[in-house]
């Protein structure tokens, strides 16, 4: 079984569409001794007036980091579709993690320092510092939700696959954060966990919040979003929850095109309404999404000729040969399999192993395994890329 830490590292490096490097600024927001805290800034191409700011905090289970380096700042997957079209500045924030021998409180200090640095330098980036928002995915949602309560000018909050109340936590439903992660990251007491929970620290007039969650989330149970939204609404704020069937901790990954498209449209509408952005048609964004995501959908009719060859994932090779035969190579072990086509996919049958089901994306160069067993990986996809030289 895959470990919680390995799954979080996989999620933290999940599929994000590429954006133009010319519009992205990578710099250092603050330093702690010899440890630099980076910041990634994406400036919209067509903004004329001052632009609102969206601060994004990555997930990854608070894993990563060394004595000399923190995990990098990243941008959310919707940046390609919304930054230029809506004229929003996206700012990716970094913070010390468990590998830096840091705590949750240290991470909040890092993030506040970076946010304050950007706001103080807002004129350099043509930023409207009166219109800001925060967002995060997975472990980043816990941090970003707390930050959103600290800044009165924060108008919106966006959380995906989130954990917002560390006191209401059943490890059987939500393995993150487990007792070991809490101990390492300075959340071992009830008081510290409460301080790290936006649920217990709502500000007066909380920001308008959008919470995205899969109903099959095996790391952070979807009731975290439902309960947090209720808390916000009961406090006089405004919160919306969007739940997805058969989705497991992947609400903002283009590898799940239908869910990704709906999530981006929800975010776009939130930006338009709460940042008061005018003269933008949501249909333009929908068309861009349809065009960009077309090749991410599965190919309906797969033929043997499209599958023959070598397919590689991070640590496994799969070779399809003619006449329904093939080989899988994992950790220097080679096993022969039979394969057949059914239900729009390819089923691999290996002796004394569970059957595996693969689908080919329309681009013809990436196939993915869909996990259907009742495990932490249920409904997740693992990509394999075709080797062009075989």
Task: State where each predicted segment sits.
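Short amphipathic alpha-helix adjacent to the substrate-entry channel of hydrolases
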Residues: 68-91
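Primarily recognizes the serine-hydrolase "nucleophile elbow" in alpha/beta-hydrolase
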Residues: 113-173
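C-terminal catalytic histidine-bearing segment of alpha/beta-hydrolase fold enzymes
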Residues: 226, 233-295
